[in-house]
Each structure stands twice: as structure tokens, then as C-alpha cells.
UniProtKB/Swiss-Prot annotation:
Part of the 50S ribosomal subunit. PANTHER family: LARGE RIBOSOMAL SUBUNIT PROTEIN UL30M, MITOCHONDRIAL RIBOSOMAL PROTEIN L30. This is Large ribosomal subunit protein uL30. Keywords: Ribonucleoprotein, Ribosomal protein. The keyword Ribosomal protein applies. The lineage of its organism: Bacteria, Bacillati, Chloroflexota, Dehalococcoidia, Dehalococcoidales. One of its GO terms (cellular component) is cytosolic large ribosomal subunit.
Length: 60
């Protein structure tokens, strides 16, 4: 399965609680942290929900 690298670049302060919960569900603990996840439809849906807070890169 393909992998994607997600980097958390903007704080969740001032945004709804469910967006902060989505950031935690993606595996983030600190701002500017990067995680590598499988490229699945569930992960893509979570990224779509917080697309204004993260940066996405394809990993080859």
C-alpha cells in the first residue's frame, strides 16, 4: 500500500473540537511533527477534514 507523509503546520486553537480530535487521531502530538500513514480512504477523509492545518506529501 502507498504511504503518505502528513505534517501538522497550524495550531488547532480557535477551531472546533472535532478538528483537534482528528489531528490526535492522525497520530500527532506536537506542532510541526510529521507522521507517515497508509494511503487509505479513511486517512484521506481525515486529512480532508483538517486540510487547512496540515501539509501532505507522497512517499515513494
Amino acid at each position: 500500500m502507498a504511504k503518505i507523509k502528513i505534517t501538522w503546520v497550524k495550531s488547532t486553537i480557535g477551531y472546533k473540537f472535532d478538528q483537534a480530535a482528528t489531528i490526535k487521531a492522525l497520530g500527532f502530538k506536537k506542532l510541526n511533527q510529521s507522521v507517515i500513514q497508509d494511503d487509505s480512504s479513511a486517512i484521506r477523509g481525515m486529512i480532508l477534514k483538517v486540510r487547512h492545518l496540515v501539509v501532505l506529501e507522497e512517499v515513494t
